[in-house]
Each structure stands twice: as C-alpha cells, then as structure tokens.
UniProtKB/Swiss-Prot annotation:
It comes from the Eukaryota. This is Chitin-binding protein 4. One of its GO terms (molecular function) is chitin binding. It comes from Moringa oleifera. One of its GO terms (biological process) is defense response to fungus. Keywords: Chitin-binding, Glycoprotein.
C-alpha cells in the first residue's frame, strides 16, 4: 500500500491529479486531498 501511495504522490507531483482506481490509492488520495488533489 505504501508503494501505491508513493506512486500516487509521483502522479500528483507530475499531473497534480491522483488517479484513484484502486482502493489503496483512494486512501492515499484522501491523504493528498489536503494538497488540493482531484481524485478521479
């Protein structure tokens, strides 16, 4: 899960958009939500 969250952070740094297709990434998206991240 931590690795998936790191991938989400990399995606956030590049596209500033966290693509949450997996439940683990959805949790990461909620955490990154404080950084104004739109969760698709």
């Amino acid at each position: 899960q931590q690795q998936q969250c790191r991938q989400g952070q990399q995606t956030h740094q590049r596209q500033r958009v966290c693509q949450a297709r997996r439940p683990a990434i959805q949790r990461c998206c909620q955490q990154l939500r404080n950084i104004q991240v739109q969760c698709r």
